[in-house]
Curated annotation (Swiss-Prot):
GO molecular function, one term: DNA binding
Protein name, per record: Uncharacterized HTH-type transcriptional regulator MG101 homolog
Keywords: DNA-binding, Transcription, Transcription regulation
UniProt keyword annotation of DNA damage present: no
Xref: SUPFAM superfamilies: Winged helix' DNA-binding domain
Top-level taxon: Bacteria
Domain HTH gntR-type: 8-77
């Protein structure tokens, strides 16, 4: 009988396979992907695991299933820039993601990340920045992701949702936040949170910097 850990590993492989097919545009929007049976045979997996994975992808709007049409289809092409409305329990947000491939990690941010994990070389990391806006379209949060090109290319608008980031940020491998540091920007007094994420083998994947612009959470006399 397959162990829970082996089951999780197999699930990661299947997630990675499907996501890379979509990200590489080998399966563009509208493409019918492999059936449950085909995936079950290809990966020597159980039907229940395949259905769990497909249901998760359905919930993230990466694939769709239409009544009257057999099979699952790619819902949309995975682009690297967008203007996307998301919804949480209280506040609608408009999230704009811009690629900053020519921008490297600022020295001050590199020093902070290095203080968290000195074993990672942050010297040549590049970044993606996501700006989130409130219902009045006022910018209240900036998220910056730093890593190597092959890591950054997996990002899409859905990665701004925390659970999706954990599930899929690194080609389908489960990602865990292992280290975090909270501080205050000397000039703006905005709250800054620095996070490092690792895979389940404790290998560093990506760094994230969160800057909260909402004046209600600025630190006074810091």
């Amino acid at each position: 009988m397959i162990s829970a850990k082996e089951q999780a590993k197999k699930g990661q492989i299947i997630y990675r396979y499907i996501l890379l097919k979509i990200q590489s545009f080998k399966w563009p929007a509208g493409t019918r992907i492999f059936s449950e049976r085909q995936l079950e045979i290809r990966f020597a997996s159980s039907r229940s695991l395949i259905r769990t994975i497909l249901n998760t992808l359905l919930g993230k709007d990466l694939i769709r299933h239409t009544k009257g049409n057999a099979g699952y289809f790619v819902a949309k092409n995975a682009g690297f820039s967008f203007f996307h409305k998301t919804q949480d329990n209280k506040l609608p947000k408009w999230a704009k993601l811009s690629t900053l491939m020519k921008n490297h990690l600022r020295e001050v941010d590199r020093d902070v990340f290095s203080s968290i994990d000195s074993g990672v070389d942050f010297g040549n990391f590049k970044g993606l920045e996501a700006k989130l806006f409130d219902e009045n379209k006022k910018n209240f949060l900036n998220l910056s992701f730093f890593g190597k090109d092959d890591v950054l290319q997996i990002f899409s608008e859905q990665n701004l949702q925390e659970q999706f980031f954990k599930d899929f940020a690194y080609n389908g491998i489960v990602v865990e936040r292992k280290s975090s540091l909270i501080c205050v920007d000397d000039e703006t007094k905005n709250l800054l949170i620095y996070d490092l994420f690792y895979d389940d083998n404790n290998k560093f994947i990506v760094a994230m910097r969160s800057e909260y612009l909402n004046p209600r959470i600025k630190i006074i006399n810091a």
